[in-house]
Amino acid sequence: MKTYRLSPSGRRSAIVLMIGALLIWMFALWTLRITLATSSDPSAGLFQAFQENLDRGLSAGQVLPALLMVVLLIATPLVLWGILEEWGAQYTPTDAGLQFTSFGIALNCPWDRITGIRRLEENADEPLDAIMVSDDLSSQIKNPLVRWLHRQSCGDRRLLIYPGLENRDDLLQEIRARSGLTDVQSALSQE
């Protein structure tokens, strides 16, 4: 049994993306603090300045950036989870099916449940493919938070084959062969 993981360059790319996402999250937190908690009194604390702004009313110039920063504060951890899941992804073809493991995730996909392979990013340097399955694989994840995060990243009836995976073409070929997919079925699942 061979296990397929991200290549060293794929891991480096994932780390750079995680650092970028963390910087965006810190920027959003800093901007939200500056937007909502500015005070004319330099010695005022964060909550005191925020309370003063609420008492006098927030302007549109404060509300709109604050809402955007709140969206970034919520969305960035979801993006981080997706990158972490990609960074830890391991695919192991076995006689029983394809095993996928990552942080807190262990999925077993029987070969007869694979219905197709869809290319999600056709024009990218390194394409992103999705294995389409007939069942919801995420129901195998016990932790409800990890299950929800996985569904947000991948969807419930597919398993992503990430770009940057070492020998990904060999893995895709083995998946097609073991699941009985023909090139016609793979092409149909791309539509």
Task: Give residue ranges: language-model regions.
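Generic detection of short hydrophobic beta-strand segments and adjacent strand-loop junctions
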Residues: 2-6, 109, 157-162
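Hydrophobic beta-strand residues in large extracellular and virion-surface proteins
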Residues: 4-6, 98, 114-117, 131-133, ...
